[in-house]
Amino acid sequence: SQIIHENSLPVGLITATEEQMERVAGELLAITKTVPNFSFQRNTIYLRFCHSDYDKGTALSELCRLEGILKDHVFCAGDHLNDLPMLTLQHAAMLACPSNAIPAVQEAVREAGGHVASLRYADGVAEGILHHGGRAASLS
């Protein structure tokens, strides 16, 4: 593993493989249970340390609060573990993921009544936007 530093402080790490990241994340998960407010966000072989209150979901909700946007008007799409916190009806009313999303993301989107696209990557996100397009337009 390679530790990432900013201003001489460790802020994250990169592993050589996803299997190695699985092991590291498992060890870190145990640490989060004993260290107050410590957490992490990860995506494939990349991991970033963070406060337990910080994730894409809380960031999305705070942005909406600051801008006065109701979650009923929010579309959200993601494909990996770091996206799971925002792919809930707590943060957005319209959820989607591309077909290349990891199984946990596809399951979360389905369980929340969102759209799992038949297309991959950005094309899948565009499909999700079109799927929710009628609803989004009716909210305007």
Language-model region placement:
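Mg2+-dependent phosphoryl-transfer enzymes with acidic/Ser/Thr/Gly-rich catalytic loops
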Residues: 49-50, 57-140
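Conserved acidic, metal-coordinating active-site core of Asp-based
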Residues: 1-77, 81-90
